[in-house]
A protein has these predicted regions:
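Active-site- or binding-pocket-proximal scaffold segments within functional domains
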Residues: 1-178
Length: 178
């Protein structure tokens, strides 16, 4: 109940939660271009937030805060595709617009978590939580593993996770990752 494991299948393999059949064109493009890699990383970020939610609400392996359908909507809102990369090379304004959209997607995810666990969060005025059972989360340890392309995906996940933690800190009016 204090440890959570999440497995994300590698690109080019079946992963229906993100719309990857792992066969035919999906397998070919997954192996050649890491198709749906971004979706896998966003799914993993949602699962990290689901783990916090499950711990604090004692829902164990039950349904998390984010459904598969909701994660797919986040994937549609988040964009690092070819068009965005080409736009980014044309100027900083387009890159900022894309980055802001991606940041808003992460903010939506974090705000939903905040709303669902508010009694467990520290009140900035009192410095206390109104609900301390099952306990106060002071640290979260994350291990990300992968081999070859999976290692690259694991590194990107860790970088996005740290960015999400920084956004979380900013949303909470703090200076560092929370």
């Amino acid at each position: 109940q204090h440890f959570f494991k999440v497995y994300v299948p590698g690109v080019g393999t079946p992963f229906m939660q993100v719309g990857d059949s792992g066969v035919g064109k999906d397998a070919l493009l997954g192996n050649a271009t890491a198709r749906y890699g971004e979706r896998r990383i966003l799914w993993a970020l949602a699962q990290a937030l689901n783990c916090v939610y499950r711990y604090l609400t004692r829902s164990g392996k039950g349904p998390g805060l984010f459904s598969a359908e909701e994660v797919m909507r986040f994937c549609e809102d988040f964009s690092l595709g070819k068009e965005e990369l080409l736009e980014a090379s044309n100027g900083a304004a387009e890159k900022r617009q894309r980055d802001n959209k991606n940041r808003r997607t992460l903010e939506v995810m974090l705000n939903k978590l905040h709303d669902s666990i508010r009694p467990h969060m520290i009140d900035p005025e009192t410095g206390q939580c109104s609900k301390v059972d099952p306990g106060r989360v002071q640290r979260i340890f994350v291990s990300a593993f992968g081999f070859s392309r999976g290692a690259a995906e694991a590194r990107v996940f860790v970088n996005w996770f740290l960015a999400m933690c920084q956004i979380d800190a900013e949303l909470r009016g703090q200076t560092g990752p929370t």
